[in-house]
Amino acid sequence: MSEINISAAAVKELREKTGAGMMDCKKALIETSGNFEEAIDFLRKKGLAAAAKKAGRIASEGLTAAKVDGLTGVVIEVNSETDFVARNEQFQDLVKDIANLAVIAKTIDTLKTFKMQSGKSVEEEIIENIATIGENLTLRRMDILEISEGAIGSYVHNEVVPNLGKISVLVGLASNAKDKAKLEALAKQIAVHVAGNNPQSIDDSSLDQALVERERKVFFEKSKEEGKPDNIIAKMVEGRIRKFFSEVVLLQQNFLFEPKLTVAEVIKNAEKELGAEIKIAKFIRYELGEGIEHEEKNFADEVAAITQG
């Protein structure tokens, strides 16, 4: 193969086409006997092989995205290894394109198979971006919100560009209220509230009962240590559970924009104003990286990783 004459012009053209280094382009052309298309595939395979190594690294940065299309909304999270990549326009465009498809896809498994504008599947496009961006990227999760009538409010906190940021929230209000603008404004306000207050459920009945019992046990043991009589302990525990509900149950939280009222009271007032029943059908709140274990490294390991490339 070394006898094949590879022109500088061919190497330059391949470099411009692929963005690969000069020596890599020359090697690709030699390995493929000067076949330009095969040389591109050769470099792509090299890039994908490099991407496979990067895929083992922990990705806990990145972006969340919220997308609403009529009565359907979706939230996704795409992770990268560093916040620097989250500010990369190529990565932002990738997340936006995936969010647009997610509204139609409905499930994450289906979404991964959907074709993007490039003709590649979402999964393939992510792998290609791992190779070109140089970091592990993962489509971590998605959730969909659908209502038959009403309004969906969206809010993205710490936006880097519209609809992409660190926290993404959707709130679906089921209602046949005629004034859609006011209903949408209320849904938007509740979405902002959810971003800031991080409720765990819509109402107390839908709250994880194991969590409630765990809190009840903690309150009971704490009250017992204080040496209170059993009948007093029971009242104290119930009081503390009510306070717990007011902190984690959306309808019982004090509303961000009117702290003297609960979210339930704000909705009740809106029902009177709009002349229709309003129900929170569902909310979704994604905070970037929540639940991901961050890799612990000591200083020596970090220096070694940098020096070894």
UniProtKB/Swiss-Prot annotation:
Subcellular compartments: Cytoplasm
Alphabetized UniProt keyword annotations: Cytoplasm, Elongation factor, Protein biosynthesis
Gene3D superfamilies: 1.10.286.20, DNA helicase RuvA subunit, C-terminal domain, Elongation factor Ts, dimerisation domain
Gene that this sequence comes from: tsf
Pfam families: EF_TS (PF00889)
Family the entry assigns: Belongs to the EF-Ts family.
NCBIfam families: tsf (TIGR00116)
Species this chain originates from: Rickettsia sibirica (strain ATCC VR-151 / 246)
Example of a GO MF term: translation elongation factor activity
Keyword Metal-binding attributed: no
Family annotation (InterPro entries): EF-Ts_dimer_sf, Transl_elong_EFTs/EF1B, Transl_elong_EFTs/EF1B_dimer, Transl_elong_Ts_CS, UBA-like_sf
Protein name per UniProt: Elongation factor Ts
Record-level GO cellular component terms: cytoplasm
PANTHER family on file: ELONGATION FACTOR TS (PTHR11741), ELONGATION FACTOR TS, MITOCHONDRIAL (PTHR11741:SF0)
Primary localization: cytoplasm
Region (Involved in Mg(2+) ion dislocation from EF-Tu): 82-85
The protein's role, per its UniProt record: Associates with the EF-Tu.GDP complex and induces the exchange of GDP to GTP. It remains bound to the aminoacyl-tRNA.EF-Tu.GTP complex up to the GTP hydrolysis stage on the ribosome.
HAMAP family: EF_Ts
